[in-house]
Amino acid sequence: MRISIKNQNFVLHQSGTAFWEEKKILLISDLHLGKIAHFRKHGMAIPEKAVLENFARLNEVLGLFDAETIIFLGDLFHSKINNEWDFFSDWTKTITQHLILVEGNHDIISKKYYSDLKIEIYSEIIIDDFLLTHHPSERENFFNFCGHIHPGIKLKGIGRQFLSLACFFRKPNQLIFPSFGEFTGNFYLVPEENDQVYAITNEEVIEIAMS
């Protein structure tokens, strides 16, 4: 799905990423790498191959877009270092894109790990009229791209049936990104007037008519 914001074009992909066409930037939020290994360490029966699924999905998205830069909108790594960092380190050596991290609340590992991989780190980034943060933020004259919330939407069906989907949640001056990572869950938001919801299905991103 392609949307236009402030005369710039963005392709919203069902992976939960967005490609900024004019800047050749791929925007991704909330990978939470390391979370699967953390759960496995504490006895949860999650298949080890699930660790590699995030990287397979990343490669799939990179194959679709001519991205020169990847900006992670926070919570790239879940908490303490574990063996998933080695997978991530190896993955970065297979790509050519410039990597940037906007720090999130879970990004607590030493910055040296990132600098060793030539990943730039910022608390926020301003590009033209766009403010890129992890936590939702409002600033006059800027449109905010952010994550943190892991937005989802519940759609009512027949009777008591509901369909729950991750989504891009758009407010007049903000777009909240869904979580990219596996096993991260959703926080279900209730749209207000002038909000727009772009729900993620297995095949595409679709705008939900809220009226």
Residues of each region from the PLM?
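Extended recognition/assembly regions associated with phosphoester-bond processing machinery
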Residues: 1-73, 78-211
